[in-house]
Amino acid sequence: METLTFEFPAGAPARGRALAGCVGSGDLEVLLEPAAGGALSIQVVTSVNGSGPRWQQLFARVFAASTAPAASIRIHDFGATPGVVRLRLEQALEEAGHD
């Protein structure tokens, strides 16, 4: 098990909380909570050691396209592919953007 942390610049706080995915399914779960301070902080707990560069590249690609909301994101990963990670992350961001 490895715990990784990342920070990215962000805009306005997320509107609400969100949960996407289920780590028990052999996938991953993304938990998102609004945060203040113009920063997006991400903590990843993964079963795959040495995967930090892969996560960094994935997040850089996702957040290069648009301004992320200020939030705290926790990801519990059980070896999900980058495509699934992006899907769950986008689902959580969309859910958190709704009133």
UniProtKB/Swiss-Prot annotation:
GO molecular function: acyl carrier activity
Alphabetized UniProt keyword annotations: Cytoplasm, Phosphoprotein
PTM sites of type O-(phosphoribosyl dephospho-coenzyme A)serine: 25
A Pfam family hit: ACP
A GO CC term assigned to this protein in UniProt: cytoplasm
Coiled coil region boundaries: none
Record note on modification: Covalently binds the prosthetic group of malonate decarboxylase.
InterPro entries from the UniProt entry: Mal_deCO2ase/Cit_lyase_ACP (IPR023439), Malonate_deCO2ase_dsu (IPR009662)
Free-text function comment from the UniProt entry: Subunit of malonate decarboxylase, it is an acyl carrier protein to which acetyl and malonyl thioester residues are bound via a 2'-(5''-phosphoribosyl)-3'-dephospho-CoA prosthetic group and turn over during the catalytic mechanism.
Assigned protein family: Belongs to the MdcC family.
Protein name as catalogued: Malonate decarboxylase acyl carrier protein
Lineage: Bacteria, Pseudomonadati, Pseudomonadota, Gammaproteobacteria, Pseudomonadales
